[in-house]
C-alpha cells in the first residue's frame, strides 16, 4: 500500500504531537504493564540511554577509522561482557543489533569453521533442545542447515537426547541460559562435557541471562556454571538491550578464541571499490546503539547492576509466591528474571487474552499451556 509523502513539511511540534497521539494505544510500559519487549531500568537509565544515543546518532560503526571513538567504545563493551562471562585470555567478540543477529553470526562462524577446519561438506546440521530460541531456526533456514530439535527432560535440555541426535555433520549444539519459554538454565556443564567428548562447537544462548546472571550470582543467587567457565563452551550470545538495560538494538556475540571469531566476518574484494570487510552481517551499524551501551554500562557499574538485579530477583520471588498462593504451579526452579507458571484447571492462554484486553502485555507458553 502506497502512502503519499506530504507536499509540504510540517513544524516539528505538530509532527511530535501526531507521534504522541499514535502511541496512545501502546502498552504503558513505564507503568510496569509490559513483561516483554521493554526492559525498564527506570527514568535515570532511560535518560542516559537517550542522551548517549543522541550524541552519536549520526555516526556509523561501519567506519572505525573515521570514528575511532565508536571503535573504542565497542571494544570496551565487548571487554566488559567477556570479563563478566569468564572468558579466557584471547577471547573475542563483537556488538550486533540484537539476539537474532548474534545467533546468526555464531552459527555462520560455526558453519565456516566446520567447512574450513573440519573439512565438512554436504548437508550440515545443528542440534538443540526444543526450548531453544527460534532464531536458530532462522539462521539454519538462511544457511540451509538442518535443524534437529530434541526432547526436554524436566523442561531442560537433555544431553543424552542431544548426543543421540549428533552425527559427523553436526556443526553446533546449543544450550540456553536461560531458555525464553521457561526461564530455566540448561545443564551447560553436561553439554560442555558432551562438546569436549565429541569435538563439538557448543553455543550458549545467554541473550536473556548474559547480563543478569553474573550479578544474581554476586548477590548470592544459586546460578550454575553457564558461561566460558565451562571448558566446552565455544561461543555465547548475550543481549545488552535486555537485562543490560542498554538502548535497542544492542547485543553481543562472544568466542572463546580469536581463531573461532575469525570465521564470523564477511570480506569481499571482487567489485570496483576495493576490499570491504564487516565484522557482522550488517554494513551500517548505528553509532547511537554502541554509544548508549557504553554509557549505560559505565554509568551503572557492578554496584548499579547488582542493585537493579536485586530488585528483579525480589520481584520474581514475589510473583512466584503470588501465583503459587492462587493455585498455579511454577515451572521448574527459575533463577533469573523469567518465571513461567501453569494452572491445572485454568487455561493460561485464556488468561493471556484477558490480560491484553486490560492493557497488560506478557508472553505465554504452550507446552504446557501457561504464562
Where do the model's predicted regions map?
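Glycine- and acidic
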Residues: 58-65, 88-94, 123, 147-150, ...
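Active-site C-terminal subdomain of aminotransferase-like
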Residues: 218-335, 342-344
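A short glycine/serine-rich beta->alpha loop
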Residues: 38-41, 61-65, 89-97, 238-241, ...
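Active-site nucleophile and cofactor-binding loops and adjacent substrate-binding regions
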Residues: 69-70, 93-100, 128-129, 365-366
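N-terminal entrance/gating region of PLP-dependent enzymes' catalytic architecture
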Residues: 1-90
